[in-house]
Structure formats: structure tokens, C-alpha cells
Amino acid sequence: MFITTWCSNDAPDSSVPRTRSKTKFTPKVRDLLFHCRYEIVDIVDEGYDMPASIGFYNDIIREFVTDDFCLTSLFEDNGQDSNNIQHRNDGCIWSIFDRLMNTNKFRDFDVIQGTFDTLQIIFFTNHESANNFIKNNLPRFMQTLHKLIACSNFFIQAKSFKFLNELFTAQTNYETRSLWMAEPAFIKLVVLAIQSNKHAVRSRAVSILEIFIRNPRNSPEVHEFIGRNRNVLIAFFFNSAPIHYYQGSPNEKEDAQYARMAYKLLNWDMQRPFTQEQLQDFEEGWTHQKKMREEQLVRTCFHDNNPRLPKVNHVYRTRIIPNQQFLREPLKFGNPFRQ
């Protein structure tokens, strides 16, 4: 039934679409895919071990999850078949993470890449359904991702950090991000991954740490951890970023990222967010200062305080000396003068 459904694609050239072709299923075929949902669940659960089958399976899953009911059936799977007989210990989503944690079975990067592509297809097609699944299974989901970012396979580490970065930057996952980033164990894993000798792991981990630094409402434990290790992180980023410009190479890009992180840590405010009373006092003081400046009761410029100096417009023009390589001919200094 499943092969019949897949071969019923309305492409005029071939009965079975190619791996990279864009499938166009009719509503009737979508209904047949929903009836084949248990077969799809078995495919997601078993996975693939050959690079040649990755694109074929991901095309099927990509088309399957476009329907909300089909996607919900993946998230609600608990190991039962169509006859409600328990033939698996867990759902198909957790089987994907279990395969990633068993790194001894992976010998090809294409298989790992295809597995993370499957996760991206499932979790980022419908953010609402994925967010409900994560919130209902948040402790286990956090523990699973923590194991992946702490594993010995650097490729799985980098892909796990990328998955978390896309998950945190989605606006619909605000509540999940807040609960997740309140855990002090998570930021410790991120800081540990920054010291990795793999460029892909370091760059992804720094992106996650940047979210921590920009968050004004960190938990007290996370806030204390950043404040206690702030100087160490600043010294690490400055020592790791000897180049403070970017001209396109990957090393210079990483140096620019490290320099930006050191600058943000230098400007990081260690005070807690303002209370309502402190915010009101600040606004009153700012309004009073603004009124005084408008009435010219406070002189803000040295020239205004000294009436003997001529008035200036505070616009300073500087002439940049041109680079010698852009001149038409080199500079000529002539012969030295002899007495």
C-alpha cells in the first residue's frame, strides 16, 4: 500500500519521483498517506544506514508532515501498531535520538546529516505541534540534547548545537527557551564546548552563549555563573581573537566572533533588572535632566562655558592619508641637502 501511494505521484515524467525532485501530491494521495501513517512511523523508527536512501526517506517524511494530523501522529506515537498492540518500547521520535546517542553505529557523516535533517523536518514544519511535544516531555528532551552536545563525536556535537540554536531563536519557543536556559548545567556544557579543538563545535557553542549574554532575565544561578567567570571568559576570548577584523576567511570570522563576545562581556551589566520603583525613579531623573538641558541651565560643552572662545559647530573633518599602493606612482623624497 505504501509503495502504491508513493508511486501515485502526479508527475508526468516518471511514476516514481527522483530524490531531488519536488513532489506534488493530490489531496487523495495525502489521505492515503494518512492511512499509511503506521508504515511511516516504522520508517522513522527504523531509520536508515545507507547514504543512498537518505534523500528518498526524507522526501517521504517531508511530504507526510505537511499535514497536521500526520505530524501529530508522529509526536503521539508510543510504540503501538494499528491493532493497539505494543511492539516497541518507545515512540519513533525518541528512536531518532537513541540512534544518535549510539555513535558506534555511525560510520558515515552523510547518515548523521540525514538524521538531523529528519529532525529538522519534523520539529520545524509546525512550530506549535513541536512546541507542545517539547513542553510535555521537557525533562527528557533536555537530558537527551545534553547527552548529544557532550558526546565524543564532534559532528553530532556541532549539529546538536545548531538544532538548539534554531530551536531557541524561534519566537514560538519562548517559554521552552526560558525554562531550558534557567538550568545552570546547560551553560556549563556550553562553556566546556567552547574549549573544543573543532571549529564547528566552538562556533555553534559561542552562538548559544551569546543568547545567554543577551538575556536580561537569566536565572540567579546562571547570572551568578556568568558573573563569577566573566573575567575568565573575557581573557579567553581576547587571547583567542588576535585579529579584530574580518576579510572572509573562516579563521578571521571566528576571531571576529570572539572579539564581539569579549566586547559584550565587557559591557555586560551585572545588576539585576530594574524594579518598578527603580525604573520610576530613573524616568523621573531623566525627565528632570532633559528639562534642565532644554532650559540651558547645564552647560554641556567647553566652548559654551568659555565665552571668550569663538563659536564652533562641533564638526571635525579629518583627512585620511591615502595608502601608497593606491597612488599612481610611489612617493619621491629627493636627495638630501648637503652643506
From Swiss-Prot:
It comes from the Eukaryota. GO terms for molecular function: protein serine/threonine kinase activator activity. This is MO25-like protein 3. GO terms for biological process: intracellular signal transduction. Belongs to the Mo25 family. It holds the Pfam family Mo25. It comes from Caenorhabditis elegans. PANTHER family: CALCIUM-BINDING PROTEIN 39-RELATED (PTHR10182), MO25-LIKE PROTEIN 3 (PTHR10182:SF32).
